[in-house]
């Protein structure tokens, strides 16, 4: 029986998130700044969010594929 990627990936992501606290803090700081800008519709934190996702993905990738082989 094959292991589902979704069942394996979730717990690995949660474990990897603790190693990406710096990028998460940067995203939260940006989010706080953007929330204060009431009239600036172009302001967003997409860059910081993508950096956080990339950090988690770099950690998850090797661990996930090792389990799915």
Swiss-Prot record:
InterPro entries according to UniProt: Cyt_b-c1_6, Ubol_cytC_Rdtase_hinge_dom, Ubol_cytC_Rdtase_hinge_dom_sf
Organism domain of life: Eukaryota
Gene Ontology cellular-component annotations: mitochondrial inner membrane; respiratory chain complex III
Record's keyword terms, sorted: Disulfide bond, Electron transport, Membrane, Mitochondrion, Mitochondrion inner membrane, Respiratory chain, Transport
Subcellular location: Mitochondrion inner membrane
UniProt cross-references to PANTHER family, sorted A to Z: CYTOCHROME B-C1 COMPLEX SUBUNIT 6, MITOCHONDRIAL, UBIQUINOL-CYTOCHROME C REDUCTASE COMPLEX 7.8 KDA PROTEIN
Quaternary structure, from the entry: Component of the ubiquinol-cytochrome c oxidoreductase (cytochrome b-c1 complex, complex III, CIII), a multisubunit enzyme composed of 3 respiratory subunits cytochrome b, cytochrome c1 and Rieske protein, 2 core protein subunits, and additional low-molecular weight protein subunits. The complex exists as an obligatory dimer and forms supercomplexes (SCs) in the inner mitochondrial membrane with cytochrome c oxidase (complex IV, CIV).
Protein name as it appears in the record: Probable cytochrome b-c1 complex subunit 6
């Amino acid at each position: 029986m094959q292991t589902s990627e979704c069942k394996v990936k979730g717990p690995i992501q949660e474990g990897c998130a603790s190693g990406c606290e710096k990028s998460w803090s940067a995203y939260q700081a940006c989010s706080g700044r953007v929330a204060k800008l009431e009239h600036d519709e172009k302001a967003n934190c997409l860059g910081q969010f993508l950096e956080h996702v990339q950090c988690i993905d770099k950690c998850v990738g090797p661990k996930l594929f090792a389990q799915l082989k």
